[in-house]
Amino acid sequence: MNVEAKYLEKTNPFTPEPARIVRTYHLTEDVKFFQVRLLDMEKALAFSYKPGQFAMLSVLGTGEAPFCLSSTPSRPGLLEFCIRKAGTVTSALFKLKENSMIGLRGPYGNGFPVEDMRGKDIVIVEGGMGVAPLRSVLLYCLDNRDQFAKVAVLYGAKRPAEMIFREEYFSLKERGDLECHLAVDRDDTGSWTENIGVVTTLFPLLSKVKPENTYSLVCGPPVMYKFVIKELLKLNIPKNQILMTLERRMKCGVGKCGHCAIDYIYTCLDGPVFTYWDVLHMRELI
C-alpha cells in the first residue's frame, strides 16, 4: 500500500472497518440479531460509543445502511444490532452466515445523555422495533445499576410472536431491582399471560414517579409518540427530560449528504436522540 493510500485509509470518514459476524439468529420472523466484532482486536476493544448512537453497516457489492447499536458500551469488544428485513441492504445482511465479513463505520450521532441521567429515575417506553436502540441504554443501566435510581420498562408489541428479545424481557420481570411491564395488542396464541392492549395501557401499572427526578426514553412507531407523550406529560415529566430517538432518512452519517436535514438540524449529527422540547420546535421530526 502506498503512502497516499494509507493516508486516505486513515482520514476518509467513509472508509469502513472490516468486521466479522460472530453470531446471528432470528428474533422474530422478519427481525434478526447480529453480533459483530471488528477484525482488528485493538480497534474492537477501543470502539467507544454511547447508548443511542448508530453505526453504518455495509455488504460488499450491495451498499450500506445505518443501524442503531443494540449493545452496551459497558461490554466492550462485541457490537450488537437488531435488524428488520426491509430493503436491499437488510435483505443482503439476512443472507449472511456466521463468520461472514461486513464493513462497519461509526459510531455516529449524539446518543443519550447518560451522565445527566445518573442518579435519576429512568422510565423506558418502547414499541415494536423501538426496542433496538433502547436496549443499549437499558443494558447500560443494568450494568451500572447502582448509578441510577428507579428503572422501569414499558414495552408493547403487536402480537406475542412479534415481541423482540422476548426471553430477555421476561427475565427482567424476575429481577427485583426494576419494573418491567409487557403488553401485546392482541393475543393469537391463547397463552399470553401479560397485559393485552397498546403500550399506553401499561402506564397505570407504573409505580409513582418523581417528575423532576425522572428521565423518560421513548422509541417506537410514529403513531405511538403522540399518545405516549400525552401520558408522560400527565406525569409532569419535564419536556427536556423526555428523550426520543428518531431515525430520519439517515444516509452518510456525517452530515454531508443532507438526506436527514430539517432546516439546520441534521438527524445524523444533532440526533438521533432529541428531547420533546426539540420536537416541539421542529415538528417535522415526527
Stretches with model-predicted labels:
Residues 35-37, 82, 105, 125, ...:
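Beta-strand residues in well-ordered beta-sheet regions across diverse protein folds
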Residues 88-251:
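FNR/FR-type flavoprotein reductase catalytic core
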Residues 258, 263, 274-286:
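Short Fe-S-cluster ligation motifs
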